[in-house]
Amino acid sequence: GGSAMISRELREAVIGDVILLSLVGIHVVVVHGGGPEISAMLKKLGKESRFVDGLRCTDAETMDVVQQVLCGKVNKNLAATLNRRGGRAIGLCGLDAGLFQARLLDAKYGLVGELARVDPAPVRDCLTAGYIPVVSTVAQGVDGENAYNINADTAAARLAVALGAEK
């Protein structure tokens, strides 16, 4: 999970493995969340993180922070780190090109969504062009109105199925 990436040693090992797999011709897709980073930013802003049933309650203000942290800071830093280490990474957000579409999971969680549709084409295009796609887990609402916070493990599994991944 994402919390494991807090460890510098583990993060460096994972990044090295991703680059090695890519260099030997294995298509690798990195799907990430960023719970600890979101919590840290909310704390800086004086906003308390609240969880129900293990899910972050995501009101509109929190969703703005989630989107900024996941699609901005975490995504771009991870892609940049892969590139610095010799990979060819490109950062994508689930909002890009209709990659992830979601519907409200349950009103008690706020803007937390469940995936309704995954379009693997943007990721497949990056893989075909020789890039390591780095995907953050914010989804466009099927209503076209809201963005939703999506569980990264669920998003990774659904994207893997949509891509026909072997592992």
Question: Predicted segments — roles?
Answer:
Residues 1-167:
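Nucleotide/pyrophosphate-binding catalytic subdomain
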